[in-house]
Design a protein with these regions (language model features):
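Solvent-exposed, polar/charged alpha-helical surfaces in well-ordered, non-transmembrane soluble domains
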Residues: 64-68, 72, 82-85, 147, ...
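Extracytoplasmic/periplasm-facing segments of secreted or lipoprotein envelope proteins
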Residues: 74-76
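Short, functionally critical alpha-helical segments immediately adjacent to catalytic or ligand/cofactor-binding
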Residues: 79-95
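Non-catalytic cell-wall polysaccharide-engagement segments
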Residues: 1-25, 31-44, 125-207
Length: 207
């Protein structure tokens, strides 16, 4: 029998032993990342409570501060606020450093009716100075006098009545007399109605 011819093969000629060489260019498919279907929840801050406040159109800075102060003290009725404002205007035109007679001076140089509501009697006049020493502030300043005013026993006696809504200016004026104890009514009532006409409302956030 004839000898079988030997066949020499190399690995290069054997099919399927190695993968084909890489092909340049883009792959035939793209890898898509998994889409996050969860919806992000945006935290919404709760709306701050609001309230209606009175402002005074065409009024001075001192008048604005006083109106804010009495509203903060719990007085909300228009007529009550107008009555208080009218009385302070009659007494001092909101000049906290006015001395009886009209001169502008410090508390220590007056010695008689002084300030927003012309504190005259010894106990009320010196009470203002004592209050300033005890709690801080100048006895000639608007802020100190407003704080003193609402801490006086004369005010405390009528405070709840002034906070009670729905009364006429004349009724609130009766309460104010026992608070201030004026000797001359003057233009208090007219000033009160003037303020009533100057009042307007605004909505503010409650802090």
């Amino acid at each position: 029998l004839p000898l079988l011819a030997s066949v020499t093969t190399s690995s290069a000629t054997l099919p399927g032993l190695f993968p084909p060489p890489p092909v340049s260019g883009l792959p035939p498919f793209s890898i898509i990342k998994e889409f996050d279907t969860k919806t992000a929840t945006k935290e919404v801050a709760p709306e701050k409570p609001k309230e209606t406040r009175l402002i005074c159109k065409g009024c001075s800075n001192e008048e604005h501060l006083a109106l804010e102060f009495f509203q903060d003290a719990g007085i909300k009725d228009r007529n009550a606020l107008a009555t208080i404002m009218g009385n302070i205007k009659q007494e001092s035109t909101f000049r906290s450093s006015v001395c009886e007679g009209g001169s502008i001076t410090s508390y220590y140089n007056c010695g008689r009716g002084y300030g927003l509501i012309q504190w005259t009697s010894a106990d009320r006049y010196y009470g203002l100075g004592d209050f300033a020493k005890k709690y801080g502030g100048s006895p000639s300043s608007l802020n100190t006098q407003l704080r003193y005013l609402t801490n006086e026993v004369q005010w405390q006696r009528i405070a709840e009545k002034m906070k009670s809504p729905g009364k006429s200016i004349n009724r609130y004026m009766d309460y104010a007399y026992s608070w201030i104890g004026w000797g001359h009514h003057g233009n208090r009532t007219r000033y009160a109605y003037d303020y009533l006409n100057k009042f307007a409302t605004k909505t503010v956030e409650v802090s």
